[in-house]
Design a protein with these regions (language model features):
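The structured alpha-helical core of multi-pass membrane proteins
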Residues: 1-479
Length: 479
C-alpha cells in the first residue's frame, strides 16, 4: 500500500507539467504490453488447447441450466474482464471514435482474449494456479520484469483516465453542470492538453482513499463491479436518447435496442448486487454525492438567475432614463458581461451609480455554451444594433471550444466596427450571496451552493479577459 500511494502521488503531482514530453512513449509501451499478453496467452493455450472448447456456447448454456444460481453469481466476476479496456476509451475526446475502434478490433481485443484463454488453459492444467493466474502464466524469471511492465502499463492507463476526466470536467463546466474552475493549457501545439488543478487533487485524494479503504485489488473488485455495470446501464440509456433524438430512429427500433442491451446490462448489475455490503457501497456513495453536488449547483444557478432577472431593468426603460442619469460619455468601448441578454446588466447600473459616465460605444455581451462541440460560421455570434450606440451581442461556444472573448469579439465584429483592444474595458459583476431560508431550496443546500459559488473560478480567468482591462463591480444578492 505505501508503494502504491507513492506512485499515485507521483502520477498526480506531474500532471501540471503535461504529458507532451513523455507522451510519445505511451503508444510503444502499450504495444509491447499487449504483445506480451498475447505471447503469454498463446504459450499456455498450446500447453492446454482444450480451453478453446470454451468458444462453444453450449457449455455456458449447460452451466446455467444445471447450476443457475452459481452461474448467475459468476457473471459478477466475468464483468471484471473489462478492467483491461476502460483506459482505451477513457480519453476518446482526444483521439476520436475511429482510431479507438480500429485499435480495439485489430489488436487490443484479440490480445486480451488470447490472454484470458491462456489463463483459463493454465487453470485447467494446474487448478492451484487460480490464486494468481496472470503472473503464474510466465516463467519464474519473468515475474519481476512482468510486474514492472504491468506497473508502467497501469500508470499509462491511469493517465488516460485522468486526461479523460480533465476533458469531461471541462465540457461539464462549459455546459454549466459544475462550478467554474481553473483550466491550464499544458501544450502550445495541442488545445486538448489541459490541466484542471482542482479536479486533479480531488481525484488524487479519492484514489488514495480507495487504496487505504480497500487495501488490495481483489477487495476493490467488489466496488468495481457495481461501478462498471451501473455505467453500462447509463451508457445504454444515453445511447437510446442519441438514437431517437439525434439519429432520428423510430421509437420501435430504439426500444428494441434498449430491450436487448438493457436486459444484458441489468442482468450483470443484479449479479453484482450482493457485493454492495462488501465494497459495492463505495461507488454508490460517490455517485450519490456527485449527483447531489451537481443538482445543487444547477438548481442554485437557476434560482439565482431568476432572482437577478426579476431585478433587472428593461433596456427600453433604461434608454428613457439614460439622459437624466448620464452627464458625459467618454471615448472607448465598454463591454458589460451579462447572463441575461434582454436586460441591463447590474454592473452597468453600478458603474453609472458610482461614476456617472458611460463609454461612447457599449456592448452588452452574453456568453452562451451550447450542446454541440464547436461553434462556427453563422452560429458563433449574434449582433443587434440598439439606440444610443449600444450593441447586444450573444457569443456562442461549443462545449469543447476554448473561450477567448477579446480575440473572438474582435474577429467576429470586424464587419460591424473595429474593436481596439487597448481602448476596450470589460465590466463584470461580482455577486455576494446573502442566504435566507426559502421554499425553492433548503438552507443546507443553499449553504453548499453558496460555497460552490464563492469558490468558483473568477470569470476573468475563465473567459481569458485581459486582467488590466477588467473592472469588477460587486453587489449583494439575497438568495
Amino acid at each position: 500500500v505505501p508503494i502504491t500511494l507513492i506512485i499515485i502521488f507521483g502520477l498526480f503531482w506531474t500532471q501540471s507539467k503535461g504529458t507532451g514530453a513523455v507522451g510519445f512513449m505511451f503508444g510503444p509501451v502499450m504495444l509491447v504490453w499487449f504483445l506480451i499478453l498475447s505471447m503469454l496467452g498463446v504459450y499456455n493455450i498450446i500447453q492446454e488447447p482444450s480451453v478453446l472448447l470454451a468458444l462453444n456456447p453450449i457449455y455456458a448454456f449447460n452451466f446455467f441450466s444445471s447450476q443457475f444460481s452459481v452461474a448467475f453469481l459468476t457473471l459478477g466476476a466475468v464483468v471484471l474482464c473489462v478492467t483491461g479496456v476502460e483506459s482505451l476509451y477513457a480519453d476518446m475526446g482526444h483521439f476520436g471514435r475511429n482510431p479507438i475502434k480500429v485499435t480495439w478490433f485489430s489488436f487490443v481485443f484479440p490480445a486480451l482474449t488470447i490472454n484470458y484463454f491462456g489463463q483459463g488453459a493454465l487453470i485447467l492444467s494446474d487448478p492451484s494456479a487460480i490464486k494468481n493466474p496472470f503472473y503464474l502464466m510466465a516463467p519464474e524469471w519473468m515475474t519481476l520484469p512482468l510486474v514492472i511492465m504491468a506497473t508502467v502499463a497501469t500508470v499509462i492507463a491511469s493517465q488516460a483516465c485522468i486526461t479523460g476526466a480533465f476533458s469531461v470536467s471541462r465540457q461539464a463546466l462549459q455546459l454549466g453542470f459544475i462550478p467554474r474552475m481553473r483550466i491550464d493549457h499544458t501544450s502550445e501545439n495541442q488545445e486538448g492538453q489541459i490541466y484542471l488543478p482542482r479536479v486533479n487533487w480531488m481525484l488524487m485524494i479519492g484514489v488514495m482513499s480507495v487504496v487505504v479503504i480497500f487495501q488490495s485489488s481483489s477487495a476493490l473488485a467488489n466496488a468495481y463491479g457495481i461501478a462498471i455495470t451501473l455505467d453500462m446501464i447509463i451508457a445504454t440509456i444515453l445511447a437510446g436518447f442519441v438514437m431517437h433524438e439525434i439519429w432520428k430512429w423510430k421509437w420501435r427500433y430504439t426500444l428494441a435496442f434498449l430491450a436487448v442491451f438493457l436486459t444484458i446490462d441489468i442482468v450483470f448489475f443484479l449479479s453484482n448486487i450482493i457485493k454492495v455490503p462488501s465494497g459495492g457501497w463505495f461507488p454508490l456513495l460517490v455517485g450519490i454525492i456527485f449527483v447531489f453536488l451537481i443538482s445543487t449547483w444547477k438548481k442554485g444557478r437557476k434560482i439565482l438567475f431568476k432572482k437577478t432577472k426579476k431585478e433587472t431593468m428593461e433596456i427600453d426603460y433604461f434608454f428613457k432614463e439614460m439622459k437624466k442619469i448620464i452627464k458625459a460619455r467618454v471615448d472607448g468601448t465598454a463591454v458589460f458581461l451579462t447572463p441575461n441578454p434582454d436586460g441591463v446588466p447590474h454592473s452597468l447600473l453600478h458603474n453609472l451609480k458610482h461614476n456617472k459616465v458611460l463609454h461612447k460605444r457599449v456592448i452588452l455581451l452574453s456568453v452562451k455554451f451550447r450542446d454541440y462541440p464547436h461553434a462556427n460560421g453563422e452560429n458563433i455570434i449574434s449582433i443587434k444594433k440598439l439606440p444610443n450606440n449600444f450593441y447586444k451581442v450573444i457569443l456562442n461556444y461549443g462545449y469543447k471550444d476554448l473561450t477567448k472573448i477579446p480575440q473572438d469579439l474582435a474577429r467576429n465584429l470586424k464587419g460591424t466596427f473595429s474593436l481596439d483592444p487597448m481602448d476596450t474595458s470589460y465590466f463584470v459583476g461580482k455577486e455576494s450571496l446573502v442566504i435566507r431560508s426559502g421554499k425553492e431550496m433548503n438552507f443546507f443546500r443553499k449553504t453548499i451552493f453558496s460555497y460552490q459559488f464563492r469558490t468558483s473560478e473568477n470569470i476573468t480567468n475563465q473567459f481569458n479577459l485581459p486582467v488590466n482591462r477588467v473592472v469588477e463591480l460587486g453587489s449583494k444578492v439575497v438568495f
